[in-house]
Amino acid sequence: MKTLILFSTRDGQTREIASYLASELKELGIQADVANVHRIEEPQWENYDRVVIGASIRYGHYHSAFQEFVKKHATRLNSMPSAFYSVNLVARKPEKRTPQTNSYARKFLMNSQWRPDRCAVIAGALRYPRYRWYDRFMIKLIMKMSGGETDTRKEVVYTDWEQVANFAREIAHLTDKPTLK
């Protein structure tokens, strides 16, 4: 069995999570390829038994390239076992780590034609020193309003790697949908 893991990232944390998922799946005996949804032209769907897509939030929105990819490939995504993970800083709060309690994931799933079999909401990373001035200012303002870290010299990884490992185990059990050839 082979899994395609696609990601849409702004600052790299969604890519790190995708790589971690691939590593966890490998330990479970499942081969996985990882690719950036912004750079992949057309996936070779017939080479995969399942697909996982992760996307990050910036200023309340997923990247348009991710949304366009999902819209374009919704029929294919629905025809095979699939999973979605949303990465955002709101999920640093444990009560905001489910598709039901995270407004970004909930809104995306309600409005999307894609119906993934599994979903996760995973906390991202706050990397102030890597941000451009404007992003550092805006994210600090948002974090101040939401009770988060405001020291712009810090980098904080909120990702719960055990949650990611558990999600990999869920992905490993995705089966039973016929794939389109």
From Swiss-Prot:
It is found in: Cell inner membrane. This is Protoporphyrinogen IX dehydrogenase [quinone]. Keywords: Cell inner membrane, Cell membrane, Flavoprotein, FMN, Membrane, Nucleotide-binding, Oxidoreductase, Porphyrin biosynthesis. PROSITE patterns: FLAVODOXIN, FLAVODOXIN_LIKE. Residues 3-172 form the Flavodoxin-like domain. It comes from the Bacteria. It comes from Escherichia coli (strain K12). Homotetramer. Homohexamer. Purified from membrane fractions associated with fumarate reductase (subunit FrdA). Pathway: Porphyrin-containing compound metabolism; protoporphyrin-IX biosynthesis; protoporphyrin-IX from protoporphyrinogen-IX: step 1/1. It catalyses: protoporphyrinogen IX + 3 a menaquinone = protoporphyrin IX + 3 a menaquinol; protoporphyrinogen IX + 3 a ubiquinone = protoporphyrin IX + 3 a ubiquinol; protoporphyrinogen IX + 3 a quinone = protoporphyrin IX + 3 a quinol. Catalyzes the 6-electron oxidation of protoporphyrinogen IX to form protoporphyrin IX; under anaerobic conditions uses menaquinone as an electron acceptor, under aerobic condition uses ubiquinone as an electron acceptor. Anaerobically in vitro transfers electrons to fumarate reductase and nitrate reductase; transfer to nitrate reductase couples this reaction to electron transfer across the cell inner membrane and thus ATP synthesis. Neither mesoporphyrinogen nor coproporphyrinogen are substrates. Under aerobic conditions in vitro forms protoporphyrin IX using ubiquinone as an electron acceptor, is able to transfer electrons to cytochrome bd oxidase and cytochrome bo oxidase; transfer to these oxidases couples this reaction to electron transfer across the cell inner membrane and thus ATP synthesis. The lineage of its organism: Bacteria, Pseudomonadati, Pseudomonadota, Gammaproteobacteria, Enterobacterales. Disruption phenotype: Loss of protoporphyrinogen IX dehydrogenase activity, grows very slowly unless supplemented with heme. Accumulates intermediates of heme synthesis such as uroporphyrinogen III, coproprophyrin III and protoporphyrinogen IX. It is a peripheral membrane protein. Its cofactor is FMN. Belongs to the HemG family. NCBIfam families: PRK11104.1. Binds 1 FMN non-covalently per subunit.
